[in-house]
Structures are given as structure tokens and as C-alpha cells.
Amino acid sequence: MSTAPGLLRQELSCPLCLQLFDAPVTAECGHSFCRACLIRVAGEPADDGTVACPCCQASTRPQALSTNLQLARLVEGLAQVPQGHCEEHLDPLSIYCEQDRTLVCGVCASLGSHRGHRLLPAAEAHARLKTQLPQQKAQLQEACMRKEKSVAVLEHQLVEVEETVRQFRGAVGEQLGKMRMFLAALESSLDREAERVRGEAGVALRRELSSLNSYLEQLRQMEKVLEEVADKPQTEFLMKFCLVTSRLQKILSESPPPARLDIQLPVISDDFKFQVWKKMFRALMPELEELTFDPSSAHPSLVVSASGRRVECSEQKAPPAGEDTCQFDKTVAVVAKQLLSQGEHYWEVEVGDKPRWALGVMAADASRRGRLHAVPSQGLWLLGLRDGKILEAHVEAKEPRALRTPERPPARIGLYLSFADGVLTFYDASNTDALTPLFSFHERLPGPVYPMFDVCWHDKGKNSQPLLLVGPDSEQA
């Protein structure tokens, strides 16, 4: 069977320059190129001396490739055929086969393998196909724009990696600052992890950049080829048009996928700190907040001490609440004077053997009038004790959620609030050397909050014990 006219020339043409091979080399993946074209398009080799194959992105070493002598001899033989003539019949290529998208001679068209195909005179085919160039050029330009945007995104992600690691190191330094000497080993470990992530992310992103830049070079090269082909004479245009179109569609179909960046670093959060607390007890806990009760917010039955750190429910009949909406009129509660709006905070409340209480935070704009529905949607995040033994979390439900009953109810409650992490955690702080987690709300607070203290009704003296704020100086009264 004879070879179809033009097919041999197509097979012996470099996919990068679209010319007959010049010093052809065959990569390890099987694709062949002019040696100079491969070196030019592949760019600088990686550390291991390899470059990506422009056709399939497989790794190859261009300097180690020897000239493909078999291809070179075929090219040399084909070069003897006059330009624009049939390789089989040596007649002028004057007819265009639409079915096979190639130029053929009159013999191929009437008697050869293209007999019965859809055929056009070369001049008519030239005029018709040339009108398709603007659309193909537009596709190429659009592909260039998309990949240029991808390059910009990757470069921005490289900056984000640096910024993420910088913020992470700052958080590590802030959390471990007070105990830096003791925790040097931990900080070193975290720093190495950050360096590893930055290194791996950087290598991955630079690899993607290299691949995209190589792909962009192919697109730009094709754009130049299109411009050159557009100005070629009829015969040469038709000979190269199919090669250009085929190569263009192949390049567009081999667009590298967008990079996905997944930075995984330990989160400096409540969980992270609790693991450290188990070894360091309270060493890394934020300093105790110097909170004081706000008498103007207290229910009329509550008595706040002069120091502002003690509050109890009086058994004497209290006057009705005033019209000040900042004051609780039904719930026997009080808030702190201090408004919390950012950062992290830790405070402790001595509850002693008080059988009923509730503690937590209250949204600054939450209502304090009437019977309160203590759930997060109403701006209340509370943990309480009922009947001297049942711990309850006031979650979003009709009834509070009963927690695991401790062997002994906590005598002191620690509350940790982190706005950045969206965490409010309650601890049993009865043991001065350890913190035992009781419950956590995991949600970002919608705005500033006040520490809230529901003293609860005195219950005819059964629940008259006070709540005491534990201060940095350990004075509670």
C-alpha cells in the first residue's frame, strides 16, 4: 500500500517548528523534535538535568539524547522531492482533499487513495480555509489570557504561602513567648514544620509555574506560526495549514490543570493549647482577665460587693427593676463591666458548692428584659449546674443538653474565649495544676460580648452561695 501524499512529510516534521526535522532527537517518551527546538522550548533543566517533554510533559534529558539517524536519513531522502510536489507521483499538489485535510496531486485525486473523496481546487481551498484563521487566532489568544491569569494566581499563592507562614510563626511566638525557654523544643518542631510546608508548597508552585510558562511558550510559538502561515503563498499555506491546525488543537487539549494549593499547618487553637496544657498545666493560658461585676446590670435581688468581684442573691424582698434596659428584670443575673470584642481571654469563677448557676457570655446587643431563652440564637452561650449535680450546656434546643455527670461538681470554672478561632471552652479549674475541659461552643461570635453570670434564685437559702471572680492577685472578695 502506498503512503498517502503529505503524510510522510507530516510525520517527518517537528511538532514545534513544523519544518522537516533538523538533527532530530527522540525523547524517552517517544516524541521526536529538532534538537534545537527541544532545548529552546523546554527551557532551563531542573536540578536533576531533566526537562518536560513539550508534548506530554514526561521528563527527559535533552543533552543525553543522540541524533536519530533513521529519522535523519528519511528527512534527507524526502528533501530531494521538489517542494509542492507529490512524494509518490512527483506531480504538483494542485488539489485539496477535504476528507483527509491534505494537498494531493491529480493522479492521487483521480486514481489513487483519494479517489471519491471530497476534493477542491487548491485555490478555492486556500480562500476558504484562510477565513478560519481569525477564529483560530482568537482561540489561541484566549488560551494565552487564561494561562497568564493562572500564572498570576500561582505567583499570588506563592506570596500567600510566605504570609501564611509568617502569621503562623507570629502566633507561635505569641503563644509560647512566656515559656519560650522551656518550650524551645516545641517551637523548633513547629518551625521545621512550617519550613517543610513552605518548601514543599514553593517547589510545587514553582513546578506548576515552569509547566505553565512552557505551555505559554508553546502557545506563543503557535501564534507566531499562525502569523507566518497566513502570509505564505497558496501552496505552502495549504501544506502547512493542516499541520498548524492539528498542532493547535493538540496544544489546546493538553492545557495543564490548575494547581491546587493545600497548606496544612498546625492550628494554634484551643485544641492545640490543651495538648500543651496537659504538660504545662496553666503555663500557656492567657493571664486572668481582671473582670468586675457591673452593678447597673444586676437583677434587683443581687448584691455586688464593693470590690466588684463578689455577687450573691439576697433573701430579702427586692424592689422591682427600673426601666433601664441594661438591667436584668427577670433573670437573676449580672454581666461584667468589661466588653470583649477580639483576641483571646481567660477568666475564672469560684462557684463553690452552689447547687445552681450558669456562666458564659452574652451578646452586647442581646435583650436583658423578660424571661431569657438561653440559647446561642438569642445571644447567650452558657454552661450551668442544676440540682447540684447535673451540668448542662445551653445549646440550640428546647432543653439544655445534659453533660457527663462528674463525680464531684466543679468548685471553680475556667472560661476560655478565642474570637479568632471561634471557640468558647469551659474548664473545671478546681485543681490549680490542671484544667479539665467540660464543654466547648464552636462558632464565631457575631460581635462583642459581655461575660455573663446567672446567679439564679436563692431558693429559700438553698442556693444563696455567692459567685466570686478570681483575679490575677487571687483576691476574690
Swiss-Prot record:
Keyword S-adenosyl-L-methionine: no
Single GO cellular component term: cytoplasmic vesicle membrane
PTM comment, free text: Disulfide bond formation at Cys-242 occurs in case of membrane damage that cause the entry of the oxidized milieu of the extracellular space, resulting in homooligomerization. S-nitrosylation at Cys-144 stabilizes TRIM72 and protects against oxidation-induced protein degradation and cell death.
GO-annotated molecular function: identical protein binding; mitogen-activated protein kinase kinase kinase binding; phosphatidylserine binding; ubiquitin conjugating enzyme binding; ubiquitin protein ligase activity; zinc ion binding
Assigned EC number: 2.3.2.27
Domain B30.2/SPRY: 271-475
Signal peptide, first to last residue: none
Biological function: Muscle-specific E3 ubiquitin-protein ligase that plays a central role in cell membrane repair by nucleating the assembly of the repair machinery at injury sites. Its ubiquitination activity is mediated by E2 ubiquitin-conjugating enzymes UBE2D1, UBE2D2 and UBE2D3. Acts as a sensor of oxidation: upon membrane damage, entry of extracellular oxidative environment results in disulfide bond formation and homooligomerization at the injury site. This oligomerization acts as a nucleation site for recruitment of TRIM72-containing vesicles to the injury site, leading to membrane patch formation.
Name of the protein described by the UniProt record: Tripartite motif-containing protein 72
